[in-house]
């Protein structure tokens, strides 16, 4: 059957060829012929005259076969015979055939590597051996979708024609078709797309400008990027320059060439522009770098502000200088009155590089004082040059009248000071008046202006003296001296009476002598009273809030600058006062009932802090500062929280939480006889210990030698059931509170309670540290205890009579708790978070010694100071767990930076709680809303100066 089919095909081919008329003038018509592999192929051209046969197939490496025979004959057809056959006569195609040779094993004739040009059509060579197929198409080798913008035309005789090839078409493809119901896939065809230049090359220079000195090396790199390596690039030739080149491919369609131009030693004549140029078929581009070679370096200063500056006292000021320098500056300093300034809390310097060889320097002056006016100089230099600029800073201060006195010869003198120099005006009005400013001014007799140093402009406050002759006034009256400067005014009044002068005949009469002696004695008495008053301790808020000034340096924030929110105001008529809880030299704390503090119909017991009638202005300001500090801190379960205040319509009242058990120190001493110590509990039934309540504390005066620091402890062991406390949740009613108070007060005290107290105080101090607040007087006497045995940190301040408290030692005009103070606080007047940690260690010793005084038997004298300096520390209290004594010792580290933070102490004690009594702290867990976000105060304070009234170290060298 195959032979018969072939014979029919050949006859059909011969018939078609023989139909072409002679001459070849009729346009040919292409036909296709399909034969099987191994069959005979015979094609005959019946054209008169000579003919030529041409054969072309899909193999690009195969040469076109030409034959001059009338007949084309192939005995054994193979897939290599697949192609187009053309019969030509006299150069014209008479007819053509495309012959398919079916091979059951091969459906596609594939060219595995194809190169195409971007934006052109490309043929993926995969012609078919058998045209009888379905769904002749294209796919990617990895099975991923074809590019979205790809369009192609399948051609059984040629393959797949892809239109408008793009760079993204690059990849591996396969032709596929359905043949005899089976999908056939070709071998891999790799398509490479040669990019077309659509833009100029991109040139990037390593620098656009270079400033050098003679003899220095100049090097600049030109980076050219393009789609392929056909790009041309070069530096425009310079005789003294050396150019090196490097190149690399950047992916499929990226190419980079680096041309580095180098001049080993530049000269002034090398100054100019250097151009790098690049070219591709799209066009040319270039970039230029400028070189400026100098014979010598330079420094140029530009003052961006007026060099004469007026600043009000208390305000911040900035001095800014811009400058250019080459080479780079070696020295950049700010000087004040020819002395170099170092960064401190009062001033700090910021340097910044703003560009090539361009710099700025800023001197920040913080809260300028009247004494900080003067000449500020900025000096900058390098190896070749130097320059400086000077600023004259004048600090304006308000005028102040120092004296208004009657001199001899009826001369009245008024002395005022301020900057700039104040102008003094005199006013007179008859009679005794409180103001005379509406009266006409009086011309002074003489005005003198005094400067600190007359040879240079004065930057400090200027003294102005003005005098008038009181004899010009014919009647008794009031004279006013007013000093005015920059709109600020200060005035003082002087009342005088015109009296008839009585001329005495004897100067030194007995009466005059007696009067002189009495006046002298009176002056001495007044001086003694003034001295006593100055030695009287001033009330001051112990809690101090700090702020960061520069890096790790901090200063105290003036509490008067803290805001006060009037939402804390509470009506005075809703307070009903009760008994006095505590009293001091300046004020007192009174128990009170507040009606409608949180609910309109509810009464609540509170503590109200107030001043005594004898308090002065400084004490009133201090109480207001304490109120502002409490409102700034916010609420926490372990501090005495602010509930309200009365600041309007009467004396200031500060309303805080009421703590029913008083201070922790006295609570511990009350519970000594019922304390349960684990070290003695198992022997409690066999031994009776001396009651600690009857054990007298040794006085400081009675002990001169070293004493063992372990206090004696006695116990009264209650039954185990007595230690079980009910756990309450939710809010307390009045009855609940009363019952809770009775239950807590009757319960015995054990180590778990002491751990709980230690933990709560550490939590409270961690909260204060997170608020940048330093306590400065942390001790058991300053910890209050309320129902549920919850401890609360407080500052008694005005409500403690420190004059009669032996814990406070007199130093200067201050009374300080020396035995609770860290060495740096004693010797350097430095109060930090770390000094609070030291005091906390002393408090732990108080706790586990059940209220004993620290350093028992040791008076605070030069020997005590010397022992502290040499590293003496107290022994462990008898009932202290070893872990708690380890915490005490770490708190007493001589290096403040080696002491733990309060957050770390909280974590250490939590381990003790979890190991011994997991339920201890469960009764007084605090809702998250009131805990605050207490974070570890990881930033250590380098130096915080005490703002206490005593600014000198407690121990001078002679005391040791």
Curated annotation (Swiss-Prot):
Spans through the membrane: 512-532
Catalytic residues of the enzyme: 777 (proton acceptor)
Pfam family for this entry, one: ig
Extracellular topology ranges: 25-511
Gene Ontology CC: cell-cell junction; external side of plasma membrane; extracellular space; fibrillar center; plasma membrane; receptor complex
Domain Protein kinase, chain residue ranges per copy: 575-913
InterPro entries, per database record: Ig-like_dom, Ig-like_dom_sf, Ig-like_fold, Ig_sub, Ig_sub2, Immunoglobulin_dom, Kinase-like_dom_sf, Prot_kinase_dom
Name the record gives this protein: Mast/stem cell growth factor receptor Kit
Location(s), subcellular: Cell membrane
Function, in words: Tyrosine-protein kinase that acts as a cell-surface receptor for the cytokine KITLG/SCF and plays an essential role in the regulation of cell survival and proliferation, hematopoiesis, stem cell maintenance, gametogenesis, mast cell development, migration and function, and in melanogenesis. In response to KITLG/SCF binding, KIT can activate several signaling pathways. Promotes phosphorylation of PIK3R1, the regulatory subunit of phosphatidylinositol 3-kinase, and subsequent activation of the kinase AKT1.
Protein modification: Ubiquitinated. KIT is rapidly ubiquitinated after autophosphorylation induced by KITLG/SCF binding, leading to internalization and degradation.
Keyword Transport on entry: no
Organism per entry: Gallus gallus
Disulphide bridges, residue numbers: 45-87, 126-175, 141-172, 222-276, 414-481
Protein EC: 2.7.10.1
